[in-house]
Amino acid sequence: MTDTSSSQPAKAWSGRFSEPVSDLVKRYTASVSFDQRMAQQDIRGSLAHAKMLARQGIIGATDLADIERGMVQIRGEIERGEFAWNLDDEDVHLNIEKRLTALVGNPGKRLHTGRSRNDQVATDIRLWLRDAIDRILALIGEFQKNLLDVAEANAATPMPGFTHLQVAQPVTFGHHLMAYFEMSRRDAERFTDCRKRVNRLPLGAAALAGTSYPIDREFVARELGFDEVCHNSLDAVSDRDFAIEFCAASALLMTHLSRLSEELILWMSPRVGFIDLADRFCTGSSIMPQKKNPDVPELVRGKTGRVNGSLIALLTLMKGQPLAYNKDNQEDKEPLFDTADTVIDTLRIYADMITGIRVKADAMRDALKQGYATATDLADYLVKKGLPFRDAHEAVALAVRAAEAKGCDLPDFSLDELRAFSPLVGEDVFAVLTVEGSLASRAHVGGTAPEQVRAAITRARGKNA
């Protein structure tokens, strides 16, 4: 069935056209259903623009006063949920402008002087994204604080370190968690760096070529807290690289949290049993009464794919566009909004979930006995006695094979049995083969010795203060 055009009010741009837009096209092209969440940023940008227009003598002081009065009322209506969003008015910008004009008359019609929706929306997005980044950085800090608390409580709690999911060498649980702290530190650095490029003002670029009005872009930048203006009008309205950069930083952060989630899931499994997770982060089964499922970490893994998808969506959106603005760019907002929402929700729940970890230290220690975790320490011991490393490696490999055949761990061998693999072995070898001895020997910066883990936590807290 062919869609027909219904009677509708004139568009802000309708003078050029001989027939109204069809209902189908109207629905297909409207963005107000999702870009209305930038309403407060749109009002902030419009107020700064109006103040600049009045300062430059482009509109009168009474016009500015009327615009400010109208915007106060509109802001209140939006905050109270009373604002009537209208699909006929396409987007957040025209909805607010139309309401302003209804409230104050001609001053509302003068607001758009020297401005296009192209630079207006670019400004709104940057203001919105700047606010989102600030919230994300605060949440990363909260997550880090709680992570450091758990790491400090377990700075000396031994557990297996793994490679290829095989027991490799002893580490401490605190040291393991500090690896994720370092990842989150880099995540915060990326968002902080991204914010610098977000914080540039596009307003004044107008549609694409600038404007003939004597505007003062630097004044608007100061009013809105931007560090500087965008230096090329075409670039200002047509690129969304700052949004792509934000999504890339988000994808990396979510990837790090996804890896931690995978470990929490494994550690919580009865087959591993290293931790338990507070009940408030788990769910049960509708059929199996014994189940306690780690749904939150599993959803973090799943939502990481969602954020990765948004990054690819934005890259694909931009890759074939000629300069300057194209309607394609309307599709930037939903992936961007969804990414920010997902990251914020994930960080909020993760900051709490970290505090809900209950460590099963005995299970961690028992696991160290199953994989010959101190074999490398024995090899290093022989090297320090003068044996070349490759020869020491071979001697210890033979000892491990013998231990497997006997069904014991290396510290369970007698001194004579160990000497059968190398005459360099002395009575001091048993101190080397203990878990505590292995941990204590990694006493350099970045090592897993408990005092080094505590020092790393102290440094981290100092930088986070």
From Swiss-Prot:
Keywords: Amino-acid biosynthesis, Arginine biosynthesis, Cytoplasm, Lyase. One of its GO terms (molecular function) is argininosuccinate lyase activity. CDD domains: Argininosuccinate_lyase. The keyword Lyase applies. Pathway: Amino-acid biosynthesis; L-arginine biosynthesis; L-arginine from L-ornithine and carbamoyl phosphate: step 3/3. GO terms for biological process: arginine biosynthetic process via ornithine; L-arginine biosynthetic process. It holds the Pfam family Lyase_1. It is found in: Cytoplasm. Its EC number is 4.3.2.1. It catalyses: 2-(N(omega)-L-arginino)succinate = fumarate + L-arginine. InterPro entries: Arg_succ_lyase_C, Argininosuccinate_lyase, Fumarase/histidase_N, Fumarate_lyase_CS, Fumarate_lyase_fam, Fumarate_lyase_N, L-Aspartase-like. GO terms for cellular component: cytosol. PROSITE patterns: FUMARATE_LYASES. HAMAP family: Arg_succ_lyase. PANTHER family: ARGININOSUCCINATE LYASE (PTHR43814:SF1). Belongs to the lyase 1 family. Argininosuccinate lyase subfamily. This is Argininosuccinate lyase. It comes from Aromatoleum aromaticum (strain DSM 19018 / LMG 30748 / EbN1) (Azoarcus sp. (strain EbN1)).
